[in-house]
Curated annotation (Swiss-Prot):
GO terms for molecular function: acetylglucosaminyltransferase activity. It comes from Homo sapiens (Human). Keywords: Differentiation, Endoplasmic reticulum, Glycoprotein, Golgi apparatus, Membrane, Signal-anchor, Spermatogenesis, Transmembrane, Transmembrane helix. The chain crosses the membrane at residues 6-26. Residues 27-374 are lumenal. This is Alpha-1,3-mannosyl-glycoprotein 4-beta-N-acetylglucosaminyltransferase-like protein MGAT4D.
Length: 374
């Protein structure tokens, strides 16, 4: 009897343990399923958050672009309201010779003959004229590198207020990249407020229609072709800048966007020009490197430009500057020594140089230059 009771008790315990085991297994399975579902929900949530973040970043970038564009438009309108944007029609009416000179471009570029009046886009300017010196700086986008702010700071800060009043600095943005144009305008209006307000600092750009598509180096495959196109465009950029500056001042000084003007440079230039006894000079070199630091009489600029335009495809502009002497100074069959002697008399060199070249990264993509002494 007692044995049966023990067996029954064991059976009941076994059944209870089995039931508990089944229940535990069921609960564990259910919990695992819930954990799996929870994990899936977490992963899905993470994916949604990642997608949302990417979308937010994209929207933020788009909003920043729109905001920058709005800031540029606001700045432009403020300049307009402050009478800081020169009116092209007024300028052309006062300077018909300028209009006629720009019209000469149609002779060299047939694709311009269908266009109306040819004139740079004046972004910042008061149409300042009647000064002694115009200083021209052509700038293009160099990617992650820019020397323009450093250049302008040295150029304008090393003038006295009276010298600043008797001069105008012209920045030509010779780049089709609108973002670069906006960045230059923003930097100048923020950093050089006094010069902008007084009209002593101007910003102009080249209309898109001015250069034909053949000058777009992006469409050229060979590196040599791209370099040739870059040099051609550089000559044309300088020509536009010279023509624009011609009616503004008595003298024109050519600079570049990657140089530093030395202390008292402007005083030294004005003193040197004022003390030249002979008036028979062609131009004065305040730098020996390239086209930097060349001072011209503004009345001669049109003749230089026409010569450059005749041979703009053949050589860089500083080489063309040498060639013009062979045409203007040397007679056919003349002894070279006599020609060089006359050349020194009308091509005056100032030493030491008043400008230091600092740009390592050239405006030509992936080209570096380390020539410093100018």
């Amino acid at each position: 009897m007692r044995t049966k009771q023990v067996n029954l008790l064991i059976t009941l315990v076994a059944v209870a343990l089995f039931s508990f085991s089944c229940f535990s297994i069921y609960r564990i399975t259910q919990t695992n399923n819930q954990l799996i579902n929870c994990r899936n929900h977490i992963l899905e949530f993470k994916e949604n958050m990642l997608h949302l973040r990417n979308k937010t970043e994209k929207n933020t970038q788009e909003m920043m672009k729109v905001l920058n564009r709005m800031k540029y438009e606001i700045t432009k309108r403020e300049i307009l309201s402050g009478n800081l944007v020169a009116q092209k029609a007024d300028i052309l009416n006062k300077n018909e010779t300028v209009s006629n000179t720009f019209e000469d471009l149609k002779f060299f570029f047939p694709h311009l003959r269908k266009e109306g009046r040819i004139y740079p886009d004046v972004i910042i300017g008061k149409g300042k004229t009647g000064v002694s010196f115009a200083l021209g700086i052509s700038t293009v986008n160099r990617g992650n590198y820019s020397y323009l702010k450093q250049t302008l700071t040295s150029v304008v800060s090393r003038m006295t207020l009276s010298q600043e009043k008797d001069s105008v600095v012209i920045v030509l943005v010779a780049d089709s990249n609108e973002d670069y144009l906006h960045s230059v305008v923003k930097m100048i209006t923020k950093k050089f407020k006094r010069q902008v307000r007084s009209g002593s600092l101007e910003v102009i750009s080249i209309p898109a229609f001015l250069y034909s598509s053949m000058l777009n180096a992006k469409h050229l495959a060979e590196a040599s072709q791209k370099l040739a196109s870059w040099r051609i465009k550089q000559v044309l950029d300088f020509c536009i800048l010279l023509l624009y500056a011609q009616p503004k001042a008595k003298y024109y000084l050519q600079l570049e966007d990657d140089i530093i003007a030395k202390e008292m440079y402007f005083t030294k230039i004005t003193d040197f020009v004022g003390n030249i006894s002979s008036n028979n000079w062609f131009f004065i070199e305040f730098s020996m490197l390239g086209f930097i630091g060349k001072l011209f009489r503004s009345e001669d600029l049109t003749h230089f430009v026409r010569f450059f335009l005749m041979f703009y495809k053949e050589k860089p502009i500083d080489w063309l500057l040498n060639d013009i002497f062979q045409v203007k100074v040397c007679d056919a069959g003349e002894d070279l020594r006599n020609c060089m002697k006359r050349k020194k008399q009308i091509r005056i060199q100032y030493k030491p140089s008043l400008f230091q070249h600092v740009g390592i990264h050239s405006s030509f993509p992936r080209k570096e230059q380390y020539e410093k002494k100018i």
